[in-house]
Swiss-Prot record:
Homology family: Belongs to the TRAFAC class TrmE-Era-EngA-EngB-Septin-like GTPase superfamily. TrmE GTPase family.
E.C. number(s) listed in UniProt: 3.6.-.-
Keyword Methyltransferase recorded: no
Pfam families in the record: MMR_HSR1, MnmE_helical, TrmE_N
Gene Ontology CC terms: cytoplasm
Cofactor: K(+)
PANTHER family xref list: TRNA MODIFICATION GTPASE GTPBP3, TRNA MODIFICATION GTPASE GTPBP3, MITOCHONDRIAL
Species: Paramagnetospirillum magneticum (strain ATCC 700264 / AMB-1) (Magnetospirillum magneticum)
Designated name of the protein: tRNA modification GTPase MnmE
Binding annotation for Mg(2+): S228, T249
Cofactor note as given: Binds 1 potassium ion per subunit.
Classification of source organism: Bacteria, Pseudomonadati, Pseudomonadota, Alphaproteobacteria, Rhodospirillales
Subunit: Homodimer. Heterotetramer of two MnmE and two MnmG subunits.
UniProt-annotated location(s): Cytoplasm
């Protein structure tokens, strides 16, 4: 008999309603003890008064009963919809402890759902992603994964490998029988096609992971080009210190933004220049490091200096760069249409002019570079590692070198894919996955 657990499934703190969840074989007994009544009709809310061991009323609320296996965890589950006060929470947890229930660990409800076959690992991860989603794009991706898109893709690959394994095993075990000569050729063709499909997903520039974790945009430029002022405009607050003194920014300053539904992390960096100051030089080194790792770069120039622009910043311009001429309110003369082959946007970070145009262009570029449509994508590093291992095994697949070895390569590939959904022994990764969860999930 597994332990019966409980947790607050809604947000902690003072609230109009608090939802408590119980799961395990003792849930029904605990619910009856709290209400002093028989269990309610399954999946129908009942208003009751909950009482402590001495019969004193704890609260007046709604209770629901979900008998196994028709529940989220696959176990007997009870939900208590009570008032969200601290006194109610303290009295309830004390009573649940008296009844032999223990507090749930983070992710324990979802872990039990997985172990009882209610969720595969990708859907369990999708629940965590949906809870953590801060933008519309993150929400949509989590819902697609929760709907089984990624699980269906991976299981389709795995099923195809199992069929190919069966064909090879037939050739091995029934060599004396009348096995069609085309069976082996068919399997080789299917395996090669599968490998190419997996490689396509590995080549997607980690877009699913970027969407989960945030798309990194780094602001680069010479000292006093207006990088910090631009960051503050984008953030809508004073995130960075703005000063007429060159070299004020010496460390990387990050702000998290919702850019048209896309999660982005914009980083302001130290001005690109040689400096005798050890601290400032370290800031410049970090700026170059962030630029190399960024998904997009904003190269900001002091427009009043055009055409004598900073050489170090010009060297940073590539296809993943937006070029910005700042201080357009002070500029004279014609504005160039492009610099180093990249279109130019002009703005005044100090006055706020042109910033909306930059935001719109950033959103357009992000959408064009990272949009994934409705197709399932790999959303975690562990997914990518597993698919890469499968591709490596399939790259070795060659029945001409021995059918037994070829069958083993297929088994290794199928096992790697099985780790994504949990179709193999994955006890070693469960703790890592479910540790990311909220307590009541």
């Amino acid at each position: 008999m597994s332990e019966t657990i409980y947790a607050l499934a809604s947000a902690a703190g003072r609230a109009g309603i608090a939802v408590w969840r119980l799961s395990g074989e003792g849930s029904g007994t605990a619910l009856s003890a709290l209400t002093g009544k028989p269990l309610p009709e399954p999946r129908r809310a009942r208003r009751v008064r909950l009482r402590d061991g001495a019969g004193e009323v704890l609260d007046d609320g709604l209770v629901l009963w979900f008998p196994a296996p028709h529940s989220f965890t696959g176990e007997d589950v009870a939900e208590l919809h009570l008032h969200g006060g601290r006194a109610v929470a303290a009295a309830l947890t004390a009573r649940l402890g008296e009844l032999g229930l223990r507090p749930a660990e983070p992710g324990e409800f979802s872990r039990r759902a997985f172990l009882n076959g209610k969720l595969d690992l990708t859907r369990a991860e999708a629940i965590a992603d949906l809870v953590d989603a801060e933008t519309a794009a993150q929400r949509r991706q989590a819902l697609r994964q929760l709907d089984g898109g990624l699980a269906g893709l991976v299981e389709g690959w795995r099923s195809a490998l199992v069929r190919a394994m069966a064909h090879l095993e037939a050739v091995i075990d029934f060599a004396d029988e009348d096995i069609p000569d085309t069976l082996l050729e068919q399997s080789v063709g299917e395996v090669r096609s599968l490998r190419r499909e997996m490689e396509v997903h590995l080549d997607e520039r980690r877009n699913g992971e970027r969407l989960r974790d945030g798309i990194h945009i780094t602001i680069l430029g010479a000292p006093n080009a207006g990088k910090s002022s631009l960051l503050n405009r984008l953030a809508g607050r004073e995130a960075a210190i703005v000063s007429a003194q060159a070299g004020t920014t010496r460390d990387v300053i990050e702000v998290h933004l919702d850019l048209g539904g896309w999660p982005v992390i914009v980083a302001d960096t130290a001005g690109l220049r040689d400096s005798a100051c050890e601290i400032e030089s370290e800031g410049v080194r970090r700026a170059a490091d962030r630029a190399a790792k960024a998904d997009l770069r904003l190269c900001v120039f002091d427009g009043t200096l055009y055409p004598n622009l900073d050489a170090a910043t010009l060297e940073m311009i590539d296809d993943a760069t937006l070029v910005v001429l700042n201080k357009r309110d002070l500029m004279t003369g014609e504005t160039p249409a492009s610099i180093n082959g990249r279109p130019v946007l002009t703005l005044s970070a100090k006055a706020g002019e042109g910033v909306d145009d930059l935001v719109a262009e950033l959103a357009r570029v992000v959408e064009s570079r990272f949009a994934m449509g409705s197709a399932p994508v790999l959303t975690r590093e562990r997914h990518r590692v597993a698919v890469a291992e499968a591709v490596a095994a399939l790259s070795r697949f060659d029945p001409g070198l021995g059918i037994e070895m070829a069958a083993e390569d297929l088994r290794l590939a199928a096992r790697s894919l099985g780790r994504i959904t949990g179709r193999v022994d994955v006890e070693e990764i469960l703790d890592v996955i479910f540790h990311e969860f909220c307590i009541g999930k």
